[in-house]
Amino acid sequence: TQINSISDFTRFMVAIAARSGELLNYSSVAQDVGVSIDTIKRWTGILQTSGIVYLLQPYSNNHLKRAIKTPKSYMLDTGLMAWLTKWLTPETIQQGAKNGQFFESFVVSEIIKSFYNHGMEPPIYFYRDTNQKEIDLLIERDGRLYPMEIKLNDKPSHAQKNFLVLAPEESRIPYY
């Protein structure tokens, strides 16, 4: 795959960094960068292969028919993410409008890297359905799902209510 315009590719990198932790909308990125959707898909593949971006797939099974199918993209290097988005000081990262998004990207990237460092493909997903119920991260181990809600505040909402979409009442999974 060839990159014909470094300036277009740089705008693409900034757009992907600014959207880290969000559903990957190829059309929106293509519009912002001014290139085709196919080009965005190719360039995303380059970032995946290079270990710069991870596409977190949505979790679904037969029971969860309303689950969305679009992956979320995460920058695996939050230092690069900060540089590309010009969030260059700790204060900007901690107090800026996207501080929660940055924190979620950091946590997810560290979990992904932990699995990679143990020679494992990360058995991780996220969940969101058409009713806007969302679980930030699901880790699948030994046939069980471990849901995680990632929040950057000292009074997180009761996220476990969203965990209940994963199983019928009689077979609820534990949440921690």
Residue ranges and their predicted role:
Residues 1-49, 55:
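Conserved helicase/translocase motor-coupling segment
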Residues 45-53, 57-176:
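A cross-kingdom feature that marks ATP-driven nucleic-acid transaction machinery
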